[in-house]
């Protein structure tokens, strides 16, 4: 079905307002064409409008970029999925010595290492930030044993970023620029705040659900060491261009092969299923991509969150549709869900599941036996 720009702009504006999202950008690739929409403001304090070339923070969508760099190294023969981290990073340590000795690249890519995932540490702005971060992982424990379940692990992606540095001889930032941004023509994608100053940049907003949020106290809440798992600075169109390369099995729009077809397929081949499909909205995970099953229609993508900004990327290979939504606050997940249920339903024939919520008439449950203090490794009680 042709993309009706006026209709989708109207729905985009209405749903953004309904869900108190200050500003958003949307890019959709369908029937061989790229369509871009913008709505709202970059900063509620200044009133500067969002445009289609505005730059937002990616959050965890950055993980797919890092996974792609790793799979390029697999293509080059520098790595295998069963390569042990310790074989690339001598002296690598986490709290569990056996995990440190045996954990593999594949387990980090697929979130099946069991390593505690939310270890965050500001190791400075220098090019040594990832090396210092990995050194500091020696006391990081396990959320669960390896290969037990999907245990979402940002820590593992920082470690993968350091592996990219060691094998390329470049910083992660430079490797990303030279190996992905440049060959794909992603001219408005970057990793550092000073690079983003050249463009119209979205400010994060924070506030109570159901109210119009206010600008965050600072623009960037992540340290540089978070780059491989959480900080690529992007436009919606650039995200779609990146995902199109995966849709086309590793080939850029100009015909340049960026990734082998085999590696592109491995990234979206399920390694493990999600037990908690409500939190992730995914049915499983590959070597980088979150995987979806929309009533029998397969897809892949990733979500991201970064201090008040939220990003959503979905690919429907059967219909050749790619869509990316970037937002700067508000009830973004509800905005995404309502918009993409309509958008993918019309353009890709996808029926997304209803949002997980309590039943209209919940039955009484005695919660007394469940009361207590719960704690997970790497997190507060």
From Swiss-Prot:
<keyword id="KW-0133">Cell shape</keyword>
<dbReference type="InterPro" id="IPR050491">
    <property type="entry name" value="Bact_CellWall_Synth/Modif"/>
</dbReference>
<feature type="active site" description="Acyl-ester intermediate">
    <location>
        <position position="60"/>
    </location>
</feature>
<dbReference type="GO" id="GO:0008360">
    <property type="term" value="P:regulation of cell shape"/>
</dbReference>
<keyword id="KW-0961">Cell wall biogenesis/degradation</keyword>
<keyword id="KW-1003">Cell membrane</keyword>
<dbReference type="Pfam" id="PF00144">
    <property type="entry name" value="Beta-lactamase"/>
</dbReference>
<keyword id="KW-0520">NAD</keyword>
<keyword id="KW-1133">Transmembrane helix</keyword>
<protein>
    <recommendedName>
        <fullName>Penicillin-binding protein 4</fullName>
    </recommendedName>
</protein>
<dbReference type="InterPro" id="IPR001466">
    <property type="entry name" value="Beta-lactam-related"/>
</dbReference>
<dbReference type="InterPro" id="IPR012338">
    <property type="entry name" value="Beta-lactam/transpept-like"/>
</dbReference>
<comment type="function">
    <text>Involved in cell wall biosynthesis and may also act as a sensor of external penicillins.</text>
</comment>
<keyword id="KW-0573">Peptidoglycan synthesis</keyword>
<keyword id="KW-0472">Membrane</keyword>
<feature type="binding site">
    <location>
        <begin position="299"/>
        <end position="308"/>
    </location>
    <ligand>
        <name>NAD(+)</name>
    </ligand>
</feature>
<feature type="transmembrane region" description="Helical">
    <location>
        <begin position="315"/>
        <end position="340"/>
    </location>
</feature>
<dbReference type="GO" id="GO:0009252">
    <property type="term" value="P:peptidoglycan biosynthetic process"/>
</dbReference>
<comment type="similarity">
    <text>Belongs to the beta-lactamase family.</text>
</comment>
<dbReference type="GO" id="GO:0005886">
    <property type="term" value="C:plasma membrane"/>
</dbReference>
<keyword id="KW-0812">Transmembrane</keyword>
<feature type="transmembrane region" description="Helical">
    <location>
        <begin position="271"/>
        <end position="291"/>
    </location>
</feature>
<dbReference type="GO" id="GO:0071555">
    <property type="term" value="P:cell wall organization"/>
</dbReference>
